[in-house]
Amino acid sequence: MQVLVRDNNVDQALKALKKKMQREGIFREMKLRGHYEKPSEKKAREKAEAVRRARKLARKKMQREGLLPMKPKPVFGAGPGAGRGGPGAGARPPR
């Protein structure tokens, strides 16, 4: 795999390389090959992945047909933990 380094901009080239590797699935493959996986474990993992893919496709199809509500788009600042962590939040009373 190759990337061009333009104007000695190594950071940009590294970013492009990482993007290519991510798209090709190299990081995932490295993680899987990091240790031996028994054939039975491989079979179970692949089956679980297939089930996950099938469920995701079915969910998307139902959403397109209007049987399920569409996933709401996240509103920044109103997610989990909103309203917590402001000034004085978690302050303990004096002893």
From Swiss-Prot:
GO terms for biological process: translation. It holds the Pfam family Ribosomal_S21. The keyword Ribonucleoprotein applies. Residues 78-89 have a biased composition (Gly residues). Signal peptide: none annotated. Transmembrane segments: none annotated. Keywords: Ribonucleoprotein, Ribosomal protein. One of its GO terms (cellular component) is ribonucleoprotein complex. Residues 55-95 are annotated as: Disordered. One of its GO terms (molecular function) is structural constituent of ribosome. Belongs to the bacterial ribosomal protein bS21 family. This is Small ribosomal subunit protein bS21. It comes from Nitrobacter hamburgensis (strain DSM 10229 / NCIMB 13809 / X14).
